[in-house]
Amino acid sequence: GVTLKDFAILDAKGDALKVIGAKGINMINLRTEWTGGPKSTNGAYGFYPVESEDVLIDGCVAIGASDAGIYVGQSKNIIVRNSIAQYNVAGIEIENSYYADVYDNLASHNTGGILIFDLPDLPQQGGHHIRVFDNESINNDTDNFAPEGNIVGEVPRGTGIIIMANSNVEVFNNLMSGNGTVNLSIVSYSDETDDPNYYPHPRGIQVHNNTYGPSGFDPDVGTGDLAKALFEISDGNMPDIFWDGVVPMSQMLFGQPKDEKLVMVEGEEVSFLTISPIKYMLGISSPIRTDKNEFKGVINPLEPINIEGI
């Protein structure tokens, strides 16, 4: 294993700290920053471990990345904790990864706070078993400054947490507030792909015991499709939690398997919106569903992540 600790990397021309193919990589008390503020010419990634196993990011600070401040991709057995991500496009991003715990972090003044993504056409995909808990994703209010063509260039300013196309994600005990578009979004990957192995829909998502402050007060309808569609569907009455409702056609007709269903246990005051895609496509009646009680169920907590020696 490798431990990197107690230093800073400022104004890197490219990515600040990239690690590929490590088994046991600890990044502790580090800082990556682009000091000129948010610019598309800033490096893409602050902390950037990929294709690695047993990844610890602890007590780190990431500022100003034009893609993601703290990014873990195509990796396995991951802990990101006690860290701060500010003024990045994506604050903290876990992508195409298996078994991750993301907790006790602050994501603020990014475009989007915390992203759990799975994308096609990568050697490792089918991201699963991710816990996001005890974080603050607040006041994410920086305009999207990603260079043209980046997937995170679609993320609207003012997004707290986005889950896209992952399986078995548990989101709990977080504070989401001050996010002008939406506090929590659960969405399918919507672009065309020829990848036969890719599954574009989220499944087995559990959301419970989070705290939601003001959101939806300044939706970024000019970036990507999410905010614009949500603004139109909701007549401008943006919810705390949005699920796009998109599932495979067979499940639209016959329902989802129990273990793939969205489960939500949140306070009465928390607002929710989803869409019935068939009603939406046929235009027969209002496609909107806002009763989160139909998604109430028993939470099956995911196992904590253990990294040997930590």
Regions of interest found by a model, annotated:
Residues 2-11, 23-36, 53-66, 76-90, ...:
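Right-handed parallel beta-helix
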Residues 19, 169-171, 184:
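Hydrophobic aliphatic residue packing
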Residues 182, 186-187, 203:
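Structured C-terminal portions of repeat-based eukaryotic scaffold domains
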